[in-house]
From Swiss-Prot:
The gene is rpl5. It comes from Trieres chinensis. Belongs to the universal ribosomal protein uL5 family. Binds 5S rRNA, forms part of the central protuberance of the 50S subunit. One of its GO terms (molecular function) is structural constituent of ribosome. This is Large ribosomal subunit protein uL5c.
Length: 238
């Protein structure tokens, strides 16, 4: 049985190292292993950030050369890497989409660029979001990865306000890798493993305390099932 109060163990990390990568390798891994010996006795089972994917859908606006070019320049400035143009796999007549038509942009960051972007995201970008109240833990998917959406590009320091004709957002997905044994590969386990790592990485989660009153993963899972049942019941009554 796992103790949900391990989410608060972030307090044991007292100083920020040169960057997020250095802090993870030299501090976070050791603290997580020390405080969760039953979960992460093998250091290879400790979850880690594998890659970050940034996506922007432009739709039919991608056919405008100027809009597409500006979006490419913004992605390059923000991520330090030239994006890949995403194209339609098949034609959809109802949406006026042709096969192989440009629809958006995507960037996959790994290694030093990934940690550089993550450091900027945590310590600068979130603070620039208007009325920011933290990230929801409910944005984890079944694989334990986390996706968040940003409404505008102006919150990044590389973007000049005078160069922006229209605000455009994008989605950011943080993909975690974990070699935990199959006995611990359930969806809820993966999600809460990601939550533990998020707290250590100083991500501003706004509702992680919701889980502190539960003593085990099974109780959290049951709570989620009850909420889903109540939601379906409300919809059926409407």
């Amino acid at each position: 049985m796992r103790n949900q109060h391990s989410l608060e163990e972030i307090a044991e990390i007292h100083s920020l190292l040169e960057d997020i990568k250095g802090e993870y390798e030299k501090g976070i891994r050791a603290v997580i292993k020390k405080n969760n010996p039953e979960l992460f006795g093998n250091p290879h089972t400790i979850p880690k950030l594998q890659k970050i994917q940034i996506n922007r859908g432009l739709g039919l606006a991608a056919q405008n050369t100027n809009i597409l070019k500006k979006s490419i320049n913004e992605f390059t400035a923000i991520t330090g890497q030239k994006p890949i143009i995403t194209r339609a796999k098949k034609a959809i007549a109802g949406f006026k989409i042709r096969e192989n038509m440009e629809l958006g942009l995507t960037v996959t960051l790994r290694g030093s660029k990934m940690y550089s972007f993550l450091t900027k995201l945590i310590f600068f970008t979130f603070a620039q979001i208007r009325d920011f109240r933290g990230l929801s833990v409910r944005s984890f998917d079944k694989a334990g990865n986390y996706t968040l959406g940003l409404k505008e590009q102006l919150i990044f320091p590389e973007i000049d306000y005078d160069d922006v004709d229209q605000t455009q957002g994008f989605s950011i997905t943080l993909v975690f890798s974990s070699t935990a044994p199959k006995s611990r590969s359930k969806t809820m386990d993966r999600v809460l493993n990601g939550m533990v790592l998020f707290k250590f990485l100083r991500f501003p989660l706004n509702d992680s305390g919701y889980y502190d009153k539960y003593s085990s993963f099974s109780e959290v899972s049951q709570a989620w099932d009850r909420k889903k049942h109540l939601r379906r019941k409300r919809w059926s009554q409407e």
